[in-house]
């Protein structure tokens, strides 16, 4: 990792933080809006799981948005974040209630990673870098991704990953937009696209290298159900999708 990467990353975090208003308890009655979470000292709260200091990671995992860090259910996770900020030993997954995160543990095993431990080759973030003032899902707005796509592109150019793994259609389309990829036709069936030879999509990083952007199903309960045609919530199809990523890794 080079010092210019550290400087560029720190500068990016500052600018993203400044682009969002600060949250106060009164904001919960404002309707669904995004704010900055002041305890987040990384680009995203997900980065505390995998990504702190990993600015040469080969694999970037990208979700839609983190959700609401003020939600009571996620206070154990936030306590771990605060420990990390104090350079204390921490475990992002300690009492973590997220089914998405639990399924990711199984999916990353297909790539040979045990993500219950620190993995210097991984960097986790969400495309939308602000935080909901209430609720954990639903009500997603494409304008949120438009606001942050330039920041995401900067982040990818800093890290220079080989593969960018996108959880869900909105995330995949947002990442392609960040790289100004113009598709000739709209994706009509996301499951079919995941399985097609058009996946992954090659994009060019600022350094001229190619990164491969993978369309993947979201691995939360609803995304998994959709990937299985509403028939089950098992991970077999997603495990098969993830196996295809291996060919693009060293």
Residue map of PLM features:
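Short flexible/disordered coil segments
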Residues: 108-115, 177-202, 234-239
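C-terminal/domain-terminus segments
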Residues: 224-250
């Amino acid at each position: 990792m080079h010092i210019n990467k550290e400087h560029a990353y720190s500068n990016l975090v500052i600018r993203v933080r400044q682009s969002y208003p600060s949250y106060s308890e009164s904001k919960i009655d404002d309707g669904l809006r995004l704010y900055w979470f002041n305890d987040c000292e990384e680009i995203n709260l997900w980065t505390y799981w995998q990504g702190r200091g990993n600015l040469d990671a080969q694999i970037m995992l990208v979700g839609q948005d983190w959700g609401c860090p003020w939600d009571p259910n996620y206070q154990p996770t936030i306590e771990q974040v605060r420990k990390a900020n104090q350079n204390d030993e921490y475990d992002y997954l300690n009492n973590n209630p997220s089914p998405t995160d639990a399924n990711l543990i199984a999916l990353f095993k297909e790539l040979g990673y045990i993500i219950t431990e620190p993995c210097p080759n991984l960097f986790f973030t969400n495309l939308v870098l602000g935080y909901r003032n209430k609720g954990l899902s639903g009500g997603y707005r494409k304008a949120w991704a438009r606001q942050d796509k330039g920041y995401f592109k900067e982040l990818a150019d800093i890290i220079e990953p080989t593969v960018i793994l996108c959880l869900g259609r909105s995330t995949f389309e947002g990442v392609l937009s960040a790289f100004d990829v113009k598709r000739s036709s709209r994706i009509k069936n996301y499951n079919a696209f995941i399985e097609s030879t058009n996946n992954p999509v090659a994009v060019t990083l600022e350094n001229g290298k190619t990164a491969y952007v993978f369309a993947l199903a979201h691995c939360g309960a609803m995304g998994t159900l959709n990937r299985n045609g509403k028939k089950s919530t098992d991970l077999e199809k997603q495990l098969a999708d993830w196996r295809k990523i291996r060919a693009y890794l060293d």
